[in-house]
A protein has these predicted regions:
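Gly/Ala-rich beta-loop-alpha elbow adjacent to hydrolase catalytic centers
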Residues: 107, 111, 115
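Conserved serine/cysteine hydrolase catalytic core
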Residues: 195-236, 242-245, 250
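C-terminal segment of N-terminal export signals and the immediately downstream linker at the start
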Residues: 23-44
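Flexible "cap/lid" loop of the alpha/beta hydrolase fold
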Residues: 124, 128-161, 195
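Active-site loop/oxyanion-hole signature of alpha/beta-hydrolase fold enzymes
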Residues: 74-104, 117-121, 141-146
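N-terminal secretory signal peptides and thylakoid transit peptides that target proteins
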Residues: 1-15
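Conserved HGGG/HGGXW glycine-rich cap/lid loop of the alpha/beta-hydrolase fold
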Residues: 45-85
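Post-His helix in hydrolase/transferase enzymes
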Residues: 251-263
Length: 267
């Protein structure tokens, strides 16, 4: 049977609800950050907009969203078209325009580019990067990434004409390596292809220079080099946690990522 986005989202929501009783561990950059994440934080922002990156769609945020909604937050997952950077940024801006007040903007992976560009929106009160790109304004991210060892997932990208995707082997091993195989296979089946043109764009803004920022480094990441993640987090002065996770910490450690977003919402 073909897996549709609706079927997939329904299945993940059910799994998220069942797993709410479990707690995932978090390694923070300092003990205070780890303990503070678990405390109740008064919410100043009631809205959260979440953007997905390459090899995924908006449903990748479902388990995190379930936890945020349980905290009373209004959540919207952007369906990033993965066509060009301006079109992807516009998809985020349209969702931000609809928010009714202060909003936390969250991005995973490639969508850190969108957070960096669209995060200057006046409704955005805080930025959260989850194993995400965080370039400076006008910076060539590809050139920056080349100053670090190439992550294994890069070798698994294949193209059908102008559309790129990850092979199943690379997806399971290098993108979703800490997920149960059955769940990773479902995620592979719904990965959204990206256009080559998407990778040529450069941000013109650096929202992290003017907005408070949080960053979750994935220490076992095989899609973005963890040391590159640490560099970007330090450069932006982000409050940083380290999660022993693959690139998909938002799925393997949804409690941890939700705690980080709630903390940003309380800023």
């Amino acid at each position: 049977m073909m897996m549709t986005r609706r079927n997939f989202s329904t299945a993940i929501v059910a799994g998220a609800a069942a797993s709410l009783i479990s707690t995932h561990g978090m390694a923070a950059s300092n003990p205070a950050a780890a303990s503070g994440a678990a405390k109740s934080v008064p919410l100043k922002a009631r809205n959260v907009v979440l953007a997905h990156g390459l090899f995924a769609d908006g449903s990748c945020w479902t388990e995190v969203i379930a936890r945020l909604q349980a905290k009373g937050l209004n959540c919207t997952a952007v369906q990033n078209p993965l066509t060009t950077l301006p079109e992807a940024v516009a998809s985020v801006q349209r969702v931000l325009d609809r928010q009714d007040g202060p909003t936390v903007l969250v991005g995973h992976s490639f969508s850190g580019m969108l957070v960096t560009e669209a995060g200057v929106h006046p409704k955005v009160s805080a930025l959260v990067y989850v194993a995400a790109r965080a370039p400076d304004a006008g910076e060539d991210y590809t050139a920056l990434a080349k100053t670090y060892p190439t992550p294994p997932a890069s070798a698994g990208i294949v193209f059908d004409g102008d559309e790129g995707r990850l092979t199943e082997e690379a997806f399971l091993r290098d993108f979703a390596g800490d997920l149960p195989k059955a769940k990773a296979e479902v995620l592979y089946a719904v990965q959204e292809p990206f256009h080559k043109a998407l990778l040529t764009g450069k941000t013109t803004q650096a929202a992290w220079r003017s907005k408070p920022s949080w960053y979750a480094v994935s220490t076992e990441d095989r899609t973005i080099n963890p040391d590159l993640e640490r560099f970007m987090a330090k450069r932006m002065g982000a409050k940083t946690i380290e999660v022993k996770a693959s690139h998909l910490s938002l799925i393997s450690h949804p409690d941890t990522i939700a705690h980080l977003i709630v903390e940003a919402a309380g800023h």
